[in-house]
From Swiss-Prot:
Belongs to the glycosyl hydrolase 13 family. GlgB subfamily. Transmembrane segments: none annotated. Catalyzes the formation of the alpha-1,6-glucosidic linkages in glycogen by scission of a 1,4-alpha-linked oligosaccharide from growing alpha-1,4-glucan chains and the subsequent attachment of the oligosaccharide to the alpha-1,6 position. This is 1,4-alpha-glucan branching enzyme GlgB. It comes from the Bacteria. Keywords: Carbohydrate metabolism, Glycogen biosynthesis, Glycogen metabolism, Glycosyltransferase, Transferase. One of its GO terms (cellular component) is cytosol. GO terms for molecular function: 1,4-alpha-glucan branching enzyme activity; cation binding; hydrolase activity, hydrolyzing O-glycosyl compounds. One of its GO terms (biological process) is glycogen biosynthetic process. It comes from Novosphingobium aromaticivorans (strain ATCC 700278 / DSM 12444 / CCUG 56034 / CIP 105152 / NBRC 16084 / F199). Gene3D superfamilies: Glycosidases (3.20.20.80), Golgi alpha-mannosidase II (2.60.40.1180), Immunoglobulins (2.60.40.10). CDD domains: AmyAc_Glg_BE, E_set_GBE_prok_N. The active site is at 404 (nucleophile), 457 (proton donor).
Length: 721
């Protein structure tokens, strides 16, 4: 039956909502026939993919529409076209059947599909005898979706997609295109308006900014050599392992030149040996996903599944992770499921409606960052995010995710005034949809990737952030492995900024943290957030003249490495960078020529080595049994001392003298009589100190030892018997 003229016009204009109903091979009253749009052709002959001639087509419309009878059943066809003495072949995408199946439809609709990154987006596959790319995108409210790219001159009329109405997914298999092809989606909204071209939410690769197209790409192909590393972390309890995290912005750790970026392979050659020599156990990268704006540091991503093109092809990141693992170093990435930017090529009003976000700005707009908040009440949005967490664990072997801005997800009134937010169904401020999403994400990654860990950046007193989220657990439990201890960071930095003479009045800024230190599995974070936006570097937060600043910083690091909790330090602070961090420039590595800065670097290196080699300092980081106060109330002298311990391990005493006053004969309570070896002293000359100490050891008798306490210093004493 010949379609009406209006349908043909719509087809040729690229506005027909169901091009598969008209194009390809169809059964007619006189047998099978083929219909194709072949712009520029004068003649066309249909062939099977196996090389069998099926029939000749005639041009029935001057705009390039061909029709003709063909032999055989419905099957993929290839057209041999001629015009002006030229010949070319076109494999007809509309002659192929769908790639997604009923099971995909069911799982996508249910929100339980845990392999979406194999199905959605662009995938190079072989389908019904042809090689090409399968495209699939979720746009349930769109009137029409087309793939446009450098393979079809960005012409929306060439490849309109098939709609799977039950799930709102549009798909098409386009034969004879390969990898590294730029593409976007042209979406016509429900109101008939044409939206800005959209990047693929599931794209595996993207163009280098300022270009914004997605790129067709194979999944990373790696001959992984990290089995031993992964087996180790799968077999242990991370809470009882040493974890010292070096937080890195990959674009500014070092730079090849002012405007450029090192590739992942170049970073691997430089960063991995440095981290290993420094004794850090983990590297945590600020977000590595594609993002358009450098000053966002990656936290406003438009390509959650695509490693940023700034650092070379995606395979380079996989090689970096593999190399780190072979060196015994774990790799964490910052992950941003809380919000996304308003760039027009991104997720904003993706199909002409508030699809990934909320329609109401009181729910869907983030006032702090001028970004949009994911709608965690939509199962498709939750699936998109949960699958992304699984994707990084599976495809790139990352060891964990540091989840950004969790507090902003948990509360509907976060950073909002009265009248700017909507209570939940119970009248409260909790965002229970976000809670359920975080639980689902943690269950998914912990359930399928042994040894994986998640860390929450959560700045409130929400209970149970790092408590299990199994069925029957308290509703508030989120299921994270760890939580950042923001209280420790705020209180201790406030204390260290005070003049030593005033610290006696603020003793609780150090002691109070132990009231809650074991309520969660904590990471102690000295992160990038503390050295930007006018806050100054950690060195410049310390009180006193230059000598005292360095002494204070060494003492502070000693306190932190001796304190219960895993450790995190932002790049540059391990050698006391003086300037604030900026993503636009490399760290000031030349500072290491100065003895004071090199001394700090050695101190951090040795802290890491002692921390990792002494179970007393890490095996009970998250349990109160691993901590005992020795001196808690000497506010007048601003001295603190505690014992770190673990079953079967030699205990370690940590002593902090937070004034410049030297104490030559300080009575230190110790639980075991005998020799205690001075394993670390921040005032040692090797670290830039004055060299005051205890000549390597002290002896405890009748429950105490008399020790020498250097000025503005931290000591660690290990019991030897």
């Amino acid at each position: 039956m010949k379609p009406p003229a209006s349908a043909i016009d719509a087809l040729l204009d690229g506005t027909h909502a169901d091009p598969f109903s008209l194009l390809g091979i169809h059964e007619g009253p006189d047998g099978a026939f083929a219909r194709a749009v072949l712009p520029g052709a004068e003649e066309a002959v249909a062939w099977s993919l196996s090389g069998k001639k099926l029939g000749k087509l005639s041009r029935v419309d001057g705009r390039g529409l061909f029709e003709g009878k063909v032999k055989g059943p419905r099957q993929p066809v290839r057209y041999a076209c001629k015009a002006d003495g030229h010949e070319w072949l076109v494999t007809d995408p509309y002659s192929f059947g769908p790639v997604l199946g009923p099971l995909d439809d069911f799982l996508i609709a249910e929100g339980t599909h845990l392999r979406l990154f194999d199905k959605m987006g662009a995938h190079l596959i072989e389908h019904e005898g042809a090689r090409g790319v399968h495209f699939a995108v979720w746009a349930p409210n769109a009137r029409l979706v087309s793939v446009v790219g450098d393979f079809n001159d960005w012409d929306h009329r060439r490849h309109p997609m098939r709609r799977r109405a039950d799930i709102g997914v549009w798909e098409i298999f386009i034969p004879d295109i390969g990898e590294h092809r730029a593409y976007k989606y042209r979406i016509v909204g429900h109101d008939g308006g044409v939206l800005p071209l959209k990047a693929d939410p599931y794209a595996l690769a993207a163009e280098f900014r300022p270009s914004t197209a997605s790129l067709t790409a194979h999944p990373v192909k790696m001959d992984w050599a990290d089995a031993a590393h992964r087996a180790h972390w799968a077999s242990v309890d991370a809470r009882r392992e040493p974890m010292s995290i070096y937080e890195v912005h990959p674009g500014s750790w070092q730079k090849p030149h002012e405007e450029g970026f090192h590739t992942w392979d170049e970073l691997a050659d430089r960063l991995i040996p440095y981290v290993a020599e420094m004794g850090f156990t983990h590297i945590e990268f600020l977000p590595v996903s594609e993002h358009p704006y450098d000053p966002s540091w990656g936290y406003q991503t438009t390509g959650l599944y695509a490693p940023s093109a700034r650092f070379g092809p995606p395979e380079g990141f996989a090689r970096f992770v593999d190399g780190a693992h072979r060196a015994g170093i774990s790799v964490l990435i910052d992950w941003v499921p809380a919000h996304f930017p308003t760039d027009e090529h991104g997720l904003v009003r993706f199909d002409g409606t508030a699809l990934y976000e909320h329609e109401d700005p009181r729910l869907g707009f983030h006032p702090d960052w001028n970004t949009l908040i994911y709608n965690f009440g939509r199962r498709e949005v939750v699936s998109f995010l949960v699958n992304n967490a699984l994707f990084w664990a599976e495809r790139y072997h990352v060891d964990g995710l540091r989840v950004d801005a969790v507090a902003s997800m948990l509360y509907r009134d976060y950073s909002r005034k009265a009248g700017e937010w909507i209570p939940n169904a119970e009248g409260g401020r909790e965002n229970w949809e976000a809670v359920e999403f975080l639980k689902a994400m943690n269950r998914a990654v912990y359930g399928s990737h042994a040894g994986f860990l998640t860390i929450a950046e959560e700045s409130t007193a929400w209970p149970g952030v790092s408590k299990p989220a199994f069925d029957g657990a308290p509703r508030e439990n989120l299921g994270f492995g760890f939580k950042w201890n923001m209280g420790f960071m705020h209180d201790t930095l406030k204390y260290m900024a005070r003049e030593p003479i005033h610290r006696r009045y603020h003793h609780d800024e150090i002691t109070f943290g132990l009231m809650y230190a074991f309520s969660e599995n904590f990471v102690l974070p000295l992160s990038h957030d503390e050295v930007v936006h006018g806050k100054g570097s950690l060195l410049n937060k310390m009180s006193g003249d230059d000598w005292q600043k360095f002494a204070n910083l060494r003492a502070y690091y000693g306190l932190m490495w001796g304190y219960p909790g895993k450790k995190l330090l932002f790049m540059g602070q391990e050698f006391a960078q003086r300037r604030e961090w900026s993503e636009a420039r490399a760290l000031d590595w030349d500072l290491l020529q100065a003895p004071a800065h090199e001394g700090i670097r050695r101190w951090v290196r040795d802290l890491n080595r002692v921390y990792a080699s002494r179970p007393a300092l890490h095996a009970r980081d998250c349990e109160p049994e691993g901590f005992e106060w020795l001196v808690v109330d000497d506010a007048e002298a601003s001295i603190f001392a505690w014992l770190r311990k673990a079953p079967g391990a030699r205990p370690v005493a940590v002593i902090c003298n937070m004034t410049p006053q030297v104490h030559d004969h300080y009575r230190l309570p110790l639980p075991l009589d005998g020799e205690w070896r001075e394993v670390l002293n921040s005032d040692a000359e090797d670290y830039g100190g004055s060299g005051i100490g205890n000549l390597g050891k002290v002896t405890a008798e009748q429950g105490a030892a008399f020790v020498v306490l250097p000025p503005l210093a931290t000591l660690m004493l290990e019991f030897e018997g």
